[in-house]
Amino acid sequence: MSKKPVRVAVTGAAGQIGYAILFRIASGEMLGKDQPVILQLLEVPVEKAQQALQGVMMELQDCAFPLLAGMEAHSDPMTAFKDVDYALLIGSRPRGPGMERAELLAVNGAIFTAQGKALNAVASRNVKVLVVGNPANTNAYIAMKSAPDLPAKNFTAMLRLDHNRALSQLASKTGKAVADIEKMAVWGNHSPTMYADYRFATINGESVKDMINDQDWNANTFLPTVGKRGAAIIAARGVSSAASAANAAIDHMRDWALGTNGKWVTMGIPSDGQYGIPKETMFGFPVTCEGGEYKVVQNLPIDAFSQECINKTLKELQDEQAGVAHLL
């Protein structure tokens, strides 16, 4: 019995991350090799962007993906989000030269207020929303606050790129396979203040912290490397990381939809008060996923260094939220 197609909205669909993600969604990498999808693609109402989107759709057609049950181009979120089961909000305004962070928050505030309202009006009531466009946590917070009729838990922000970056640094440091690392956690904001925490991590049952046993490396090499990896990629390639961001978005959605089999992953989610994080703050937590729901890993001890890191990233998030309060 073949499954009924699900509707997947992708914003910024003709952008770099969009180009890196759409073919993987259509091939079944995100929702499973037995799940047909209808792609509802949103781009800005500018002729050049809409034309580029048509080109991407031509390529998608030319792949003849068996699971691609349909696709549509849109310039209005009210039509793009109609009845969607999954929404990947990738499109956002990047920070231009000389642009203040407050300006960036205001411009994106307008985009994500409109998209949150559209999801509220027309999306499936069980829609799973992932915000990739930066500042991801605050954009997700804005969308969530603009959609009062949808459960807050349906809105998430992407911390998986930080999580995957941390895994690869640990694999490289220990000389072990990245797939063998379990129980990695990333706390906080998707920004250089995020706190990648391997205190609980294991490789084949052995403690990674004991294996590395170097707090100086943790504080002065590991955390800055993971936190500033995006900037390092821009410096090397001249453009921001798109393929790795697309890959992290696929990982995030796949795990949320299909489950993690008890493995820890990191998701930016509205806090329910866990670990002293104020309610509704869009914050990275270690979670496990099962049956289409995520659950925060509870009762982890937080030492003084970790608390300091968590407080720092929380303060940044609270400042960002305060900066958009007037838009909500």
From Swiss-Prot:
<dbReference type="GO" id="GO:0006108">
    <property type="term" value="P:malate metabolic process"/>
</dbReference>
<dbReference type="GO" id="GO:0030060">
    <property type="term" value="F:L-malate dehydrogenase (NAD+) activity"/>
</dbReference>
<dbReference type="Pfam" id="PF02866">
    <property type="entry name" value="Ldh_1_C"/>
</dbReference>
<dbReference type="InterPro" id="IPR001236">
    <property type="entry name" value="Lactate/malate_DH_N"/>
</dbReference>
<feature type="binding site">
    <location>
        <begin position="132"/>
        <end position="134"/>
    </location>
    <ligand>
        <name>NAD(+)</name>
    </ligand>
</feature>
<feature type="binding site">
    <location>
        <position position="165"/>
    </location>
    <ligand>
        <name>substrate</name>
    </ligand>
</feature>
<feature type="binding site">
    <location>
        <position position="134"/>
    </location>
    <ligand>
        <name>substrate</name>
    </ligand>
</feature>
<dbReference type="InterPro" id="IPR001557">
    <property type="entry name" value="L-lactate/malate_DH"/>
</dbReference>
<dbReference type="InterPro" id="IPR036291">
    <property type="entry name" value="NAD(P)-bd_dom_sf"/>
</dbReference>
<feature type="binding site">
    <location>
        <position position="95"/>
    </location>
    <ligand>
        <name>substrate</name>
    </ligand>
</feature>
<comment type="similarity">
    <text>Belongs to the LDH/MDH superfamily. MDH type 2 family.</text>
</comment>
<dbReference type="InterPro" id="IPR010945">
    <property type="entry name" value="Malate_DH_type2"/>
</dbReference>
<keyword id="KW-0560">Oxidoreductase</keyword>
<dbReference type="InterPro" id="IPR015955">
    <property type="entry name" value="Lactate_DH/Glyco_Ohase_4_C"/>
</dbReference>
<feature type="binding site">
    <location>
        <position position="108"/>
    </location>
    <ligand>
        <name>NAD(+)</name>
    </ligand>
</feature>
<feature type="active site" description="Proton acceptor">
    <location>
        <position position="190"/>
    </location>
</feature>
<comment type="function">
    <text>Catalyzes the reversible oxidation of malate to oxaloacetate.</text>
</comment>
<keyword id="KW-0520">NAD</keyword>
<feature type="binding site">
    <location>
        <begin position="12"/>
        <end position="18"/>
    </location>
    <ligand>
        <name>NAD(+)</name>
    </ligand>
</feature>
<feature type="binding site">
    <location>
        <position position="101"/>
    </location>
    <ligand>
        <name>substrate</name>
    </ligand>
</feature>
<protein>
    <recommendedName>
        <fullName>Malate dehydrogenase 1</fullName>
        <ecNumber>1.1.1.37</ecNumber>
    </recommendedName>
</protein>
<feature type="binding site">
    <location>
        <position position="115"/>
    </location>
    <ligand>
        <name>NAD(+)</name>
    </ligand>
</feature>
<dbReference type="Pfam" id="PF00056">
    <property type="entry name" value="Ldh_1_N"/>
</dbReference>
<dbReference type="InterPro" id="IPR022383">
    <property type="entry name" value="Lactate/malate_DH_C"/>
</dbReference>
<keyword id="KW-0816">Tricarboxylic acid cycle</keyword>
<dbReference type="GO" id="GO:0006099">
    <property type="term" value="P:tricarboxylic acid cycle"/>
</dbReference>
